[in-house]
Amino acid sequence: QLHPLYLSGCPTTANCGSLGTPTNPALSCEHLKSVCADTASDFYYIESAGLYHKVFCEMDIEGGGWARYGRSNQGTTWNYVDEDAAEITLDIINASEVKEMTDLKYNRFLVQTDVVFKMKADDSVNPSRLTTRSLPWLEESPLFIPDYGNDHTRIEFPSGSVDRVTCIPGSSSKCGQGGGLPTANGLSKPFFFQSLFFSPRGTGASAHNDQWNRNKYTWDGSYYFVYAK
């Protein structure tokens, strides 16, 4: 049986006003965009592979037709810059969103954020553990600085990219030596952050003689979105 908005296998703009509603769900955000090109970004109902979801469809970026996941309006919370004391846990993409991405079998992804991210361990142990999901496979993987950070190990977003990190060494480092870290000055494979546990405390976290805090992190911004189709 053909979907009600398909005639002889070809999409039609008939009933665009009802497509994506509870009584007439679309097959995907991409399907909704292809049938109803002028559809605005908003929440719509999607039914695919026997699964029924209410999804925010982004229709304006990169050709539109993307399902959007993540958080926004976090500017008063995500304001940690060179933090060396506060221990925090942040959920960026929740487990139900990851399950939905998996259930709906997305294979194209786009990460957008205004967050500035950095984390370092300098001759100390940084207990911070960041949970990532690989793209496009959505495999869970931890990201952390293993053992002592040696002379200096820092990870951050590289210039012009927010779906991977680079590892910046000092005279010695833990870059490329576990924890999901890329090689020195290299790039990781694409991923998105699912959750973050930042803890600047740990063995050798500060040098008391000169008050030099060896562990720091920065997570400063207002939104983090993962788009999928």
Curated annotation (Swiss-Prot):
Where it mainly occurs, coarsely classed, is secreted
- Give the superkingdom in one word: Eukaryota
In its UniProt entry, what is this protein called? Echinolectin 1
Q: Which sites does the entry annotate for glycosylation?
A: 94
Where found?
Answer: Secreted
A GO-annotated cellular component: extracellular region
Do you know which InterPro entries this protein is assigned to? Fibrinogen-like_C (IPR036056)
The membrane spanning regions, by residue number, are: none
| Source organism of this protein record | Echinometra lucunter (Rock-boring urchin)
Keyword Phosphoprotein in record: no
Sorted alphabetically, the keyword list is: Glycoprotein, Secreted
